Design a protein with these regions (language model features):
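Positively charged n-region of N-terminal signal peptides that target proteins for export
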Residues: 1-4
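Repetitive helical segments and hydrophobic/amphipathic motifs
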Residues: 11-12
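C-terminal motif of bacterial Sec signal peptides marking the signal peptidase cleavage site
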Residues: 15-18
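Bacterial signal peptide processing site
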Residues: 20-22
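Short, solvent-exposed recognition patches
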Residues: 27-32, 36-110
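A short, solvent-exposed beta-edge/loop patch
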Residues: 89-155
Length: 155
């Protein structure tokens, strides 16, 4: 159930993203680290999606990195649009600032589903999405640690 929920969350996370066309995305990411620790689900020049290897875990994670067009990345309302989208789906906003939004998407049968979306321009204009399925409620600190882990893949 957790894996299905997280897959669904990953699809939701990509709803508002448009691709850029400059450098290959792999040139910005630590692919060696990603390949050693995760299973890559999808990969092309503008997008990579990878998830936990099938090990028993209390939190199952799917990471998405997507290059964006500059005009979309610089849209000052992108986080507000995401917030509006998630609120329309009856989700709870846990945290929001100008570059990051953390959402509790679903609580069902002692399972929790979260989405974290963040925008990073330290190397290129990237959308980072982390979808998490957990058998326990995660604190805001734990969710930020997962975002930090996602950002650690950027070279």
């Amino acid at each position: 159930m957790k894996k299905f929920l997280v897959f669904f969350l990953a699809i939701l996370a990509l709803t508002f993203v448009a691709c850029g066309k400059d450098k290959n995305l792999e040139s910005y990411l630590d692919m060696e680290k990603i390949q050693s620790e995760f299973n890559i689900d999808e990969k092309d020049d503008e997008h990579i999606k990878f998830k936990d290897k099938d090990e028993p875990r209390s939190a199952y994670r799917i990471f998405n990195f997507q290059k964006m067009k500059s005009v979309d990345f610089k849209n000052p309302k992108k986080i507000d649009k995401l917030e509006e989208f998630y609120l329309g789906k009856n989700c709870d906003i846990i945290y929001k600032d100008e570059s990051t939004i953390i959402i509790l998407v679903l609580v069902q049968d002692n399972s929790y589903a979260y989405n974290i979306q963040s925008f990073d321009d330290s190397k290129t204009e990237l959308m980072i999405a982390v979808s998490i399925g957990s058998d326990k409620e995660l604190s805001e600190t734990e969710l930020f640690n997962l975002l930090d882990e996602a950002k650690s893949f950027i070279k």
